[in-house]
Amino acid sequence: MVDVSGIPGAMRLPSALVRLLENVVRRAPSDEAACEAARRVVEAGLSGEAGEEVDFMPARVLFQDFTGVPVFCDFAAMRDAMTARGGDPARVNPRIPCVLVVDHSVAADEAGCPSALADNLAVEARRNAERFAFLKWAGASFDNVTIVPPGQGICHQLNVERFCEVVGTDALWGGEGAMACFDTLVGTDSHTTTANGLGVMGWGVGGIEAEAAALGQPIPMLVPRVVELRLTGELAPGVSAMDLALTVAELLRAEGVVGQVVEATGPGALSLSVTQRACVSNMCPEYGSTAVLFPMDGKLFDYLRLTGRDGAEVAFAEAYVRAQGLLDPEVPRVYGKTLELDLASVGTSLAGPSRPHNRTTPAGLKGRFEGAAARNGHGDMAERFTVETGEGTFELGHGAIAIAAITSCTTATDAAMVVAAGLAARRAVEAGLAPKPWVKKVLAPGSRAAGLLLERAGLRGPLERLGFYTCGYGCMSCIGNSGEILGCLKPWASSMELASVLSGNRNFDGRISPDVAQNYLASPALVVAYSIAGTVDVDLSVEPLGTAACGSPVMLADLMPTDEEVAAVLSEVLDASLYEEGTASLMEGDATWRLIEAAPSATFPWDPDSTYIRRPPYFEIAEACRTFSLEGARCLVDLGDFVTTDHISPAGAIAAGSPAAAYLEDRGVDPDRFNTYGARRGNHEVMERGTFANVKLENRLAGGERGCVTRDLLTGDLTSVWDAAEDYRAHGVPLVVLAGRMYGSGSSRDWAAKGPLLQGVRAVVAGSFERIHRSNLVGMGIVPLELVDGDAASLGLDGSEVISVDPVDFSGGLPDPAVVWVHGLQRGGKTVDFRCRVRVDTPTEGAYLTAGGILPYVLESLL
């Protein structure tokens, strides 16, 4: 037992580090180890800088199905490997609770009609029958696994509404004993940080790190630097949580908080509702911080009661938080830096066209759109395109909105924003306004409770009058499952600069739809407004949305409800019965799900003909690497700044003519059944062919072409990335990826590391790395090398070089040397020598590399 209150300065730690301190001390294997871990946390906290490595042991793991299916494929393969080595496959079992929510596979194939929800659920079940059967097997065959069936909601919203405990006991989370402790988690989706709005410490990790955590392995991490975001004032009337989230994203991306924890403090933080806080925390990956933690207060405990948590458990949690000293906002705490934001300065906001931190306003959107369109070669705003719709023929210009989507846990978790969208729709109907006929309207509530809220408030009808019929209870447009744009715009997709407006958290190139060039994030009420405008080439601060039936112009302000109107609706319909009814059938699923049979077994019966679920090869191809070096390597792709994991491993539709499409066609799969890359993540043979296959990927070796194209440096020919990788493999040539700043930003997508590994990539040379992706690379045995002396352009690198890397020794854990020389031999015999920092940041990560990756490392620990 360690009394941390006796450690000088421990009570002055940021509240985030109080939680971390409790975790590392409680989970330490001995009192001596606990004292050492406590010292590291306290010293780092009081210094205001990042500290040494500690072992974080989350209480639970949250999965969504796109990342969860490959995790359980890996578990099943690990059981096979355990059996092959003479071990007991039952030892491969989660030690802590794991919840997987099926939320990523539903798509808005049908929209704008009363049958959309039922039709999309039916298509989802047909497309994903193999995946769903596998998940049912996993739920029956592994301990501590809960599968939430499709059609129930988004994992992060359900986590906030149902699964977050805030405080629990060891016994609750798979251990023994009744000692209280803070709820903590990791999730295989970067927006796991939504829970930070409830004061719950958690963040996104790659699937491979989540696997290790589920199997009882600690997650090594450096004690993070904690930055204070002091909020003052209150939000102005009509300003939404989404407006605040986009403002914070702009502020913190500019400040640079990658790998740091942000702690919201001050009277402004306490003025926000719990779900407003959750909206801000949800978007924390968009500026690279590990977490954005909000304070615990009376509003939190009221929210827990509202959402149906047991009253005695809530009282217990409140008493524990008070005993830990976290209910007193006046306790002086030490931070590495303090930033300030006056909430009264936040205004109505959007973000785009391709980065969530590129904030603008309704007044600035027109200029933002036109500037981006000009850069895309569509600068003639007078150009017109004849579009035939069911309501007539229209002459449209660039900026026409193809998709308007009320979607995502980012905004649907906040009941006020959901109600505001419904009230805006009601005002539009009363004024005689309607969305333009070329706009595809998507409504995807984040949970059944959110959908029930609209129904109880009498707001579902107005939304449906505008064409916003519920399409599904899942992520949908936010992750690119938008379905096809309407047929009237499809012929013009390559000629017009089309746009989307959505209430989601990401808008990367090609993410929402391959046919849409620009994507803008906004609150749900603004989505309703822009669907009526029909274009983003408009200044809604001065231009009308349309003309009312009485002949008067209708402005944006005329549509937006007041805070008092929203509050009046919430006071009538928002109560515990809403959440009780909304989650009553959470674990049951529909009739199709209930009919799926899956008998439990120690090992999975792999189907050799399956194109969805195949046994991954990681345990067979793993190479132990005590000393890393490269000779004669070539660059597979040469990329720029802000390359996202979606660029590396797309989740969207499998394009005809792509290597993945050819693979599926060779196995008798019709093109209309290709499904998406996300749905095929249980098949490594599809995914390795789909790596670097995003249609918007810009590769400097591709001769100006976009997509899965590169130059095979052995032949000089332009070919697919997959075919080039296969040629290099046949000739025994190791591969590197060359990239710019913030490589691997975006989703916590482990396939963005698994795919390159299977293509033969041994190292990534980049200007900088996003947190989760860097750890994923290490976990798969790929070495991240961060440029020290400049970027590729300033160094004179063009991607054609023959690359060699001097030896790096990992036998001691941390890389030796920490900064290594890399040599690029160019045509003509010139050599470019430059230094890279080896971004293997902890001794445990070094141990992963020496074992050939985290999966072989964990397997050896279980034998």
Regions found by a protein language model. Give the residues of each.
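Segments forming glycine/polar-rich beta-alpha architectures that bind adenosine-containing cofactors
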Residues: S601-R673
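Extracellular/luminal Protease-associated
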Residues: T265-L272, N505, A730-E770
